[in-house]
């Protein structure tokens, strides 16, 4: 079966200005949120919670292994998902709030010592869930492909969206610079001379702001946009594709 819409005229424009504006803002603040976590995660781990090198290696290995399994399952789910209101939009909408929450938890560790097994369990769980949610919420970017059957309009949407997203990826730097003015300043003896909060608190406030903006604008965007390009409801087995890869002699040549 094929999902159809009333009008699939590929010669006219389908996206309203408000729909375009809402979508670009939603994905823009998504890029800002992701950029905040990506750019400052290393500083948070090394200088705020002070996770030692061994535990960082353990964390990275476990998260990578579990992330592969979880990510594979999520990709299968997305590939076979076909909702009444679209393929990508419902997933991006439902996963927005959990993404905001676990993205925030990436910079919030409720343990005085991160180098304990309890804290490591917490960090692994948060990182794995967050990475899984990144895969789910990335469907917001895929939504642009099915918003219009008009190729020219689609290309214009993708170009506008890409340009704004590239700008918003740098927004966390501005946010950190602004909040940094109110961070504690210390003298040579380590005494606080000015400021209102620590660097840890600054990160928490900045990420909370990014999370709230992302959830608000992405939710609005996914409620406003429409998927207008039909798609096939046939479910494909991921193992069929994997079998073709395994049987390919070039795959084994490159692997070995």
Language model features: what each stretch is:
Residues 2-256:
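Membrane-embedded alpha-helical bundles of multi-pass transporters/translocases
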């Amino acid at each position: 079966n094929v999902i159809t819409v009333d009008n699939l005229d590929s010669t006219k424009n389908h996206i309203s200005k408000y729909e375009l504006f809402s979508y670009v803002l939603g994905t823009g603040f998504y890029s800002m949120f992701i950029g905040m976590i990506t750019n400052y995660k290393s500083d948070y781990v090394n200088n705020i919670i002070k996770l030692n090198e061994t535990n960082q290696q353990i964390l990275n290995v476990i998260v990578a292994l579990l992330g592969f399994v979880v990510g594979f399952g999520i990709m299968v789910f997305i590939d076979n998902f076909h909702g009444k209101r679209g393929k990508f939009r419902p997933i991006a909408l439902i996963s927005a709030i959990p993404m905001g929450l676990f993205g925030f938890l990436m910079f919030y560790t409720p343990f005085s010592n991160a180098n304990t097994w309890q804290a490591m369990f917490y960090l692994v769980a948060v990182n794995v869930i967050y990475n899984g949610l990144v895969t789910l919420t990335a469907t917001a970017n895929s939504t642009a492909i099915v918003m219009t059957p008009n190729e020219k309009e689609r290309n214009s949407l993708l170009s506008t969206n890409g340009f704004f997203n590239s700008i918003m990826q740098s927004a966390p730097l501005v946010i950190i610079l602004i909040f940094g003015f109110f961070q504690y300043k210390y003298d040579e003896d380590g005494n606080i001379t000015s400021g209102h909060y620590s660097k840890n608190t600054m990160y928490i406030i900045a990420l909370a702001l990014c999370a709230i903006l992302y959830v608000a604008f992405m939710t609005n965007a996914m409620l406003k946009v429409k998927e207008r390009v039909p798609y096939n409801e046939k479910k494909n087995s991921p193992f069929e594709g994997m079998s073709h890869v395994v049987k390919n002699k070039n795959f084994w040549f490159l692997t070995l």
